[in-house]
């Protein structure tokens, strides 16, 4: 509103007193009308944006855009962590992306446990692995909605699974090699597709859960040096050995998320590699989901004991987002994205790239049906009693039997009649 300056001649002290009395009242009344209008407009704007992003009749892209456009820079940056906080004024609930499902729903109470990934790879059975992943996603959905009904929202209760691990197991010193499907690129690619399809479901509208292909790329231990390793790889080895499984995950399974690795590839941190994240993942493969860092990987950019590729957390955060990393897994000193606001102010990064990252993240949550009525989401009705059901337990026994491989028969088979087997240890009677 345009401000006016009043110039009224005052003849007497009485008039002066009257003018002094009335003028503050006029200012006060004007001030009321000025402050109320913007407040009402802002409230109406927020209500309209809420109506838009919750309107299931609108295209998904329009709903997400309405939500992101209504957020402040600080709110958007806060959503770029695995433990994204609630935005109460917009009705956005808190969400933690951290969950695992390599061979069963992890860390969320009891669940059916299948053999570790390296064992399931030994089955050489795409269809059965897909069935196993379907069981895992059934149980994950059932658990998620049970938590939701109780008002519980915490780490490991979500629907974004940081699985499968489709790295190539080349180095026997890698203590987590059992999480992979082994050292064969073809087998790993085929099984990765089967597992991802089982996790994500086959509905045309909604994701059952969101799978994450990890760790992109050339990551295979040993663990002790994973934060500082620099793997120098030829194009031939990169494209024939380390990348095929990721290409299949994107092209054949439409995987929703990719986790970038701790290590450097040809001198560049994987989570800051334009070659990996822009040129290969998005341009060559056509990936349109979100990219998240392994936990603490962005801090490795400037950590003297790690890559020390840059000196400041702000530069590291801007570098990662500029290269295409959308989500930072990290807390405390590892939470480098806390410096993104400073990076925007200093011109290290444009806010439009923050918008792009947050849009990708919310697209995943919307695809999972998190902002729609449960009645619209087909997977929301999976009963909790499916968790650990007899059918699922029978499948895990079958998987265990199929995973056993005898490399050399030194008189072991056939088993002699009457032989006794001792089962020793605290889990001997654990179903």
Residue ranges, per PLM feature:
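N-terminal secretory signal peptides that target proteins for export/translocation
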Residues: 1-13
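Intrinsically disordered, low-complexity serine/threonine-rich segments
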Residues: 9, 26, 36-38
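Intrinsically disordered, low-complexity Ser/Thr/Pro-rich tracts
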Residues: 14, 18, 107-109
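Bacterial N-terminal signal peptides
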Residues: 17-30
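Glycoside hydrolase catalytic-domain context in secreted enzymes
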Residues: 32-431
């Amino acid at each position: 509103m345009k401000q006016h300056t009043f110039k009224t001649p005052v003849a007497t002290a009485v008039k002066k007193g009257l003018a002094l009395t009335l003028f503050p009242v006029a200012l006060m009344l004007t001030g009321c009308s000025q402050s109320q209008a913007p407040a009402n407009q802002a409230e109406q704007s927020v209500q309209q944006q809420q109506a838009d992003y919750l309107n299931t009749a609108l295209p998904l892209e329009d709903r997400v855009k309405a939500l992101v456009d209504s957020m402040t820079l600080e709110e958007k940056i806060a959503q770029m962590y695995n433990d994204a906080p609630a935005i109460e004024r917009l009705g956005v609930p808190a969400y933690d992306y951290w969950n695992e499902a390599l061979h069963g729903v992890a860390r969320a109470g009891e669940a059916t446990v299948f053999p570790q990934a390296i064992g399931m790879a030994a089955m050489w059975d795409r269809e059965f692995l897909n069935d196993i992943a379907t069981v895992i996603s059934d149980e994950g959905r059932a658990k998620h909605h049970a938590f939701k009904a109780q008002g519980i929202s915490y780490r490991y209760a979500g629907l974004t699974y940081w699985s499968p691990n489709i790295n190539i197991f080349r180095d026997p010193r890698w203590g987590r090699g059992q999480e992979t499907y082994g050292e064969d690129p073809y087998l790993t690619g085929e099984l990765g597709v089967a597992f991802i399809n089982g996790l994500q479901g086959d509905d045309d509208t909604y994701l059952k859960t969101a799978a994450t292909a990890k760790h992109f790329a050339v990551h295979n231990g040993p663990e002790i040096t994973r934060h500082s390793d620099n793997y120098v790889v030829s194009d031939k080895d990169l494209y024939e050995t380390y990348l095929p499984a990721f290409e299949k995950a994107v092209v054949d399974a439409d995987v929703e998320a990719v986790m970038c690795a701790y290590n450097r590839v040809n001198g560049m941190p994987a989570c800051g590699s334009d070659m990996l994240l822009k040129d290969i993942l998005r341009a060559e493969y056509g990936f349109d989901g979100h990219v998240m860092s392994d936990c603490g990987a962005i801090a490795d950019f400037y950590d003297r004991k790690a890559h020390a590729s840059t000196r400041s957390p702000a530069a590291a955060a801007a570098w990662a987002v500029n290269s295409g990393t959308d989500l930072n897994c990290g807390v405390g000193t590892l939470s480098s994205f806390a410096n993104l606001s400073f990076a925007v102010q200093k011109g290290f990064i444009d806010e439009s790239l923050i918008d792009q990252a947050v849009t990708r993240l919310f697209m995943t949550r919307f695809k999972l049906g998190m902002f729609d009525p449960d009645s619209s989401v087909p997977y929301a009705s999976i009963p909790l009693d499916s968790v650990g059901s007899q059918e699922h337990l029978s499948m895990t026994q079958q998987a265990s039997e199929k995973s056993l491989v005898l490399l050399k028969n030194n008189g072991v088979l056939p088993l002699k009649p009457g032989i006794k087997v001792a089962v020793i240890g605290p889990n001997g009677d654990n179903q």
